[in-house]
Swiss-Prot record:
Its EC number is 3.4.11.1, 3.4.11.10. Keywords: Aminopeptidase, Cytoplasm, Hydrolase, Manganese, Metal-binding, Protease. Mn(2+) 2 binds at residues 267, 272, 290, 351. Presumably involved in the processing and regular turnover of intracellular proteins. Catalyzes the removal of unsubstituted N-terminal amino acids from various peptides. It comes from Tolumonas auensis (strain DSM 9187 / NBRC 110442 / TA 4). PROSITE patterns: CYTOSOL_AP. GO terms for cellular component: cytoplasm. The active site is at 279, 353. It catalyses: Release of an N-terminal amino acid, Xaa-|-Yaa-, in which Xaa is preferably Leu, but may be other amino acids including Pro although not Arg or Lys, and Yaa may be Pro. Amino acid amides and methyl esters are also readily hydrolyzed, but rates on arylamides are exceedingly low; Release of an N-terminal amino acid, preferentially leucine, but not glutamic or aspartic acids. This is Probable cytosol aminopeptidase. GO terms for molecular function: manganese ion binding; metalloaminopeptidase activity. Mn(2+) 1 binds at residues 272, 349, 351. Its main location: cytoplasm.
Length: 500
């Protein structure tokens, strides 16, 4: 969809539809009051009649409003004016897009970006409107033989800002919002792919494809033979039961001549059966989403390719498949990781940390400024935080604060969990340096504690996205998270300013 920004009076807009807000109880927004004046009280008469209360998400579509050049006016309920926050703002944008898409309005001018949202500026409102609109219109229907097609879908949406000074800010917000939502789309498309198609080799092909389309990105793919030469035995153990070869794709974005790189490491288990410690059948189909970390890294690199910030970033897609087989690794095995540390396997379904620990050792060679790993790592994180926030752990307070700040700015929430030394005691082994699972108590934290043993040489953070990477049930599918958080973090690091 095409987006634009302008600053003008609502009654003078020649458009298929203009969108304005109404507050609860039956109170016109400032822009709606302008329309009411030029229409001799037409809107206020409708409200007095009880046609719209103004509750969040209510919609009323009007045709041929007197004194207004637009063909239609869409009144949108925004709840109580003083309570309009970022969550409600996204809800009303989502409902607005859905309604416009069904009205036959192929283009519209939206004045909702002039509403006051607590603690948010014009840049935030326009960018979030773009991201929300794009995500609302997302479909994954590649494998459907009969695709649903709207007769006259929404093609163009223009956001109005209060002053002409905000036009350049709005244009930058649209550019950022489009890049992030395009990155989210790539993330969602790859994650939603069925596991018979999205294998480690498929992940590698997508990494190469992005490099082919962007002069700032190069991709190198490392297969099992080279992994063996590097001593990545923990990573390889996970892949032993699968006929699909493990592949690690290393993508380098070069936007600065000599800055130290920030490294993003994405867990890429394209299917996780649990291995010998096999998972229950119910819900196992969703284990195709166990590569959500790698998908989010690919999506973030896609956003970087569009935004071209002056920063160096390395994205690693750690692709593998965890399957049961006569060659599969077993509970009781002891593995020697690339770092030389030994790991006693208690559960083959705690495999993501075995893949990641070797990749975290591998990336030492880049002498990174900081490393962030992203993984659908533990069900325990879902129990702790649900689907609203990703779990964050770090060995470096400033890095953790940067990521939390990026989560607030982007609306892609994260919550920090502790990594106290006491948790390390849960992963001690009588036979090796550590075990690969610390049991049920604090399971998300002990997984982070395990990874922390491989990150002594750099500043590191871990994002557990098991609760945020995908949805189940009627809305089943990838969410595209945490692409907004990661992209915002990198934009902040690159010093990208919002105002010109």
């Amino acid at each position: 969809m095409e987006f634009g920004v302008k600053s003008g009076s609502p009654e003078k807009q020649r458009s298929a539809c203009i969108v304005v807000g109404v507050f609860e109880p039956r109170r016109l927004s400032a822009v709606a009051e302008q329309l009411d004046r030029v229409s001799d009280g037409y809107l206020s008469s409708l409200l007095r009649r009880g046609d719209l209360e103004g509750k969040t998400g209510q919609m009323l579509l009007l045709h041929q409003v007197p004194g207004v050049l637009s063909e239609r006016v869409l009144l949108v309920g925004c709840g109580k004016e003083r309570e309009l926050d970022e969550r409600q703002f996204k809800q009303i944008i989502q409902k607005t897009i859905s309604t416009l898409n069904e009205t036959g309005s192929m283009e519209a001018v939206c004045f909702l970006t002039e509403l006051h949202v607590k603690g948010r500026d014009a840049y935030w409102k326009v960018r979030q409107a773009v991201e929300t609109a794009q995500n609302s219109l997302y479909t994954f229907d590649q494998f459907k033989t009969n695709k649903a097609e709207l007769r006259r879908p929404l093609r163009k949406l223009v956001f109005n800002v209060a002053t002409r000074r905000e036009l350049s800010i709005g244009e930058k917000a649209i550019a950022h919002g489009l890049a992030i939502s395009n990155g989210m789309k790539i993330c969602r498309d790859v994650a939603n792919m069925p596991p018979n198609i999205c294998t480690p080799a498929y992940l590698a092909s997508q990494a190469r494809r992005l490099a082919d389309s962007c002069q700032y990105i190069t991709t190198k793919v490392i297969g099992e033979q080279q992994m063996a030469e590097l001593g990545m035995n923990a990573y390889l153990a996970v892949a032993k039961g699968s006929s699909n070869e493990a592949m690690m794709s290393v993508m380098e974005y070069k936007g600065h001549p000599d800055a130290k790189p920030i490294v993003l490491v994405g867990k890429g288990l394209t299917f996780d059966s649990g291995g010998i410690s096999i998972k229950p059948a119910e819900g196992m189909d969703e284990m195709k989403y166990d590569m959500g970390g790698a998908a989010s890294v690919l999506g973030t690199m896609t956003a970087l390719a569009e935004l071209k910030p002056p920063i160096n970033v390395i994205g690693v897609l750690a692709g593998a498949e965890n399957m049961p087989d006569g060659k599969a690794y077993r509970p009781g095995d002891i593995l020697t990781s690339m770092s030389g540390q030994t790991i006693e396997v208690l559960n083959t379904d705690a495999e993501g940390r075995l893949v990641l620990c070797d990749v975290l050792t591998y990336v030492e060679r880049f002498e990174p400024e900081s490393v962030v790993d992203i993984a659908t790592l533990t069900g325990a994180c879902v129990i702790a935080l649900g689907s609203h926030a990703s779990g964050l752990m770090s060995n470096h307070n400033p890095l953790a604060h940067e990521l939390l700040n990026a989560s607030e700015l982007s609306g892609d929430k994260a919550w920090r969990l502790p990594l106290w030394d006491e948790y390390q005691e849960q992963i001690e082994s009588p036979f090796a340096d550590m075990v690969n699972t610390g049991g049920r108590p604090a399971g998300a934290i002990t997984a982070g504690a395990f990874l922390s043993r491989f990150t002594k040489k750099y500043n590191w953070a871990h994002l557990d996205i098991a609760g945020t990477a995908w949805k189940s049930g009627k809305e089943k599918g990838s969410t595209g998270r945490p692409v907004p958080l990661l992209t915002q973090f990198l934009l902040n690091r690159a010093g990208v300013e919002v105002e010109d």
